[in-house]
Amino acid sequence: MCSACAIIRPRSSNSAVEIAGDEIRIDFTGTAPQYDGNLNCPLAVTKSACYFVVRCLTEPDLPASGGAFAPVTVTAPDGCLVNARRPAAVVAGNTETSSRIVDVVFAALGELLPVPAAGQGTMNNLAFGNDRFTYYETVGGGQGACPEGDGPSGVHVAMSNTLATPAEAIELEYPLRVGRWELRLGSGGAGAHRGGDGVVRELRVLEDCRLSVLAERRRHMPPGRGGGEDGARGRTLVNGEEQPPKLTRQLHVGDVVRLETPGGGGQGAE
C-alpha cells in the first residue's frame, strides 16, 4: 500500500492506494471533515479525479467506460472534505479540491510507478461582471515534468479542460483590455526535466465592475519529484498589490488585474 497527504487550506486530504492483483483501491480515510467554506467536494467529483489519474497511467486507448473503471474502488468517510453532504458548499471542490486530489493520488502511486511532478494545481477561476456583462474564465499554467521529458507550458492541468479565450475575443465582447498575455518564463521548476511555465494574464477594466478570483497554489508551490525543484507559486495582483487566493472586490475604471499562474514541478536533479 502507498499513501500521501496534501494540505488544502484550511483542511487536509489523505489518500492511500492499494494495488491488489487487477484491482486498485483508493481510500481517503483520515481526510478532514467537511466545513463551512466552499472547498468541499462531492464523492462523484472525487471519483472522477481518481479515474483521471488511472487514465493517465494506463494505455491511452483504454475507453472511458464503466467497464474500464470497474477494477477501481474509491472510498471516503461520509461527511468528509472529499465526500461532502448537503448543505455543504462545493463550488471550489469541483475546481480546486479536485486538482489536489489528483496531486495526492499521483503522489501515492509515485511510490510504485513513474509519475509526473505536480502541475499548477489550480484552475485560476477569474470572473468580472456588473449589471451589463459577465466574464468568466479558467486560466492555464504549468504542467509537472514527467520522468521522460519536460512539462508543457501554458496548459490546463488535471481536471480542467477549457480553452484559452483569445485576447481579440475578450476586447471585442467585453469592456476589458488585455495588457499582457504571455508565458511566465522561468516559473517551471528546474530539474533533469523542467516543469512547464505558467502564464501572465493582465486585464484593464473599462467599466466599474466586480472581480472574483478563486485559486490555489498562492502560498504553497507545486512540488517537484526525485530532486526536481518546485514550480513557482501563483500570484493575483490588483494595481500591483498582491491579493489573497480567494477574493471578491469592487473594481473601478482603469484598474488592472494581473494573474501570474503557477509553474509545474521539475523532475529529477539537474
Roles of regions detected by a PLM:
Residues 1-270:
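Glycine/proline-enriched, intrinsically flexible loops and inter-domain linkers
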